[in-house]
């Protein structure tokens, strides 16, 4: 029905192109007039366009700066502040509207200018990544259409070989005229550097500056790159710079400008494939004993896994024996279902599933236990030591498994019993027979026991995942004594990336390599929320249409399919389906041998290192020369890809040969039918399959593509084989037989769609959780940036003081404790405040608060008069920044802990997301209270020290510098890791050229409390966890 409607009214993409066509006609009209202009007059055109755009925007920028400056006035009332904030927001909106209007106005002339520039550069030679390249590109009409789509803030889907890199020059040049900076985001640093060097002549011809962000650059180099009109870099480099800017100790250390316009190359890879893994800057966990912990528990897990394997073997024996006598026996089906739940990748089990009727039997038994919301599934799992859910990527330890591990640990079931901390602490407090010291000791024991057991349970869970869900040469490889993650979408080794939450350490223990130390989160943001910072976002890729709904729902990005310059001549064949992998591999090798005999180049796409090496061994046995491109051979990637289109070439590649590469056909290959693409299995994402097909048939070249599939492939086994198995059973297929039908291909695509929907749900859920943190992050980072950019922060300090005075006065009035009030004010503010006990009882707390505010204000005023204004400014900034950084780190740790356990609330019929929002809000309110309290305390107690004490301060700063360098930037699951540059990142130590800063402690007249004593402030916490935390 939809196809009939599209034929009558035209498709969405046809309508999109129809709207753009008049602009393309106008561009070409102007382009025809530029040819006759001499070089100088032509260059002046670019200068004139830039001046026209800037003249329109400068008045808005001036007004915005004036308003921002007014907001910094220390004597402003709250009402004036709110009014100016609204005015500023309106100004910024008008600024964005004016920017869009002027750029739309000059678009035809600018695009024509870029096109003519490309024509004038033809024949010129440039060095790109060390190679000489002759410029031979002038944008076609379809490329002009792509450029317009990108400028409009949409995603342009363009087929392989259609020149996406050249297309980007058009909107990049146009938007760079604003002077606000344009970011071009690539999937790796090689492409960032290459594209910058390749396209730079177009920009430099008209005086636009270019820069690139690479790992390892120092802060000043990064800042200079961001100050350029156009900046290239990877999504992780841009994201980490944003996080580091919000950890900076001074405004001079920040490197980024405002977020105006970003064009994301391979947008589906960046915004979808990478979106499940948040960017994290982390630091080492002090006193972490990771190695011992994992080494100690590893033997238990190995014994548990062996016990499960033996159990599975027994179940398979029972099922095989029973099925010989009773082909459709329910108990045999139940045994096989237990095998599926206990060891789903068992080769013997997978082979059994290809036998007639077996798959159907297992499915029918599983459906029986899945009735009533899976209420009976525990009956299946209870016989196992643990249950594996491959689809959800989770493992559930059963009661039988817990008993097994309990005996190995000599703790029986106690290992899995976490003490109820709240009730046990309350019981200790209520026990009148215990002395205060005994209470402290018993409380410590409860906390220690809880910490040890929860830590052990976490380690057990991660080791079990490492042994059952993560396979060497599939999810990761081991190289040079290190566990290296393999990107499932590109097949590339992700150098330096690490799995989070202790999983990487568990895999390191499994593979007997060095176990790296654990880390804690210092700053984090998801890819989705980072790119939402930009005023305008656009992207380009060869494969976006299948994810159009996700792009719109998450990023509000429309997808427009750009027509090709030449019709696609590639022939895409229906899939060939075999029963077993062995049959499929034999068929692939035979097909490669057939193609190689006539000289037609063939690219064999695989989903893992293991499969590529298996096929390579089989081809070697047939004496067929070939190249292998996988995570272990990536160093020769450019050389191998360059040769893949030559006559007689045979290339086996994981998904690596997909992005940023063009395979050009050698002499005589077109006549043979072009490049032949042979997929060894379907990927779980249709986009990756389309990327592989797209290697052939570029720019109208001939080509062919086909996928070979078996029922043992993970995708078919998990999501799509039921109908296909039924068809094969009915047709009575024998070994070696193959099914080829469009119905089968459609069935496989439906299976892929299921996986895509599941992955979308995961990414969407991640975003819903991170939206909570995003709101909190914005509040904290806004406070931090304000503190960095403003001069004196006295007004803010005085506001905090007023709140503090009323809070403590009310608290101690309620308990009628004037001595407690005096002691707390002395300890927290270093202010001596005295109040008569009789007057304290008579007066309302407001009067005490006013007296306290007056005394504290006078103390602060005396401090101001005794110190230069510059030093007071640094004291106030240090108070705000150091407290925000410390408390925000602690808050992130608490949020991590909350996230880890929040899903358990579902067992209590509660929505984990709703519970998470409520709990996170409570934690955030407490965080803000603590930040305000601590900031005030530090601002009052911070004083310059004498020269005699400066050596100790310098030593502390050196220790901090060492800790600072140990911070790393990484994805939660996997992203680039490298040391922070020495002159970048957080500067939590206040540096003064002449003086040093230290917190002045009040003079004590009573005995100092011990580390484990109750804190004298009355908080109920131990001294070491409260006022003594920094000692």
UniProtKB/Swiss-Prot annotation:
Residues that bind Zn(2+): 1015, 1017, 1026-1027
Coiled coil segments of this chain: none
Record carries keyword Calcium: no
Cofactor note: May bind 1 zinc ion per subunit.
Location of the protein in the cell: Cell inner membrane; Cytoplasm
SMART domains, A to Z: SecA_DEAD (SM00957), SecA_PP_bind (SM00958)
Topology relative to the membrane: Peripheral membrane protein
Family to which the UniProt record says this protein belongs: Belongs to the SecA family.
The name this protein goes by in its record: Protein translocase subunit SecA
Gene this protein is translated from: secA
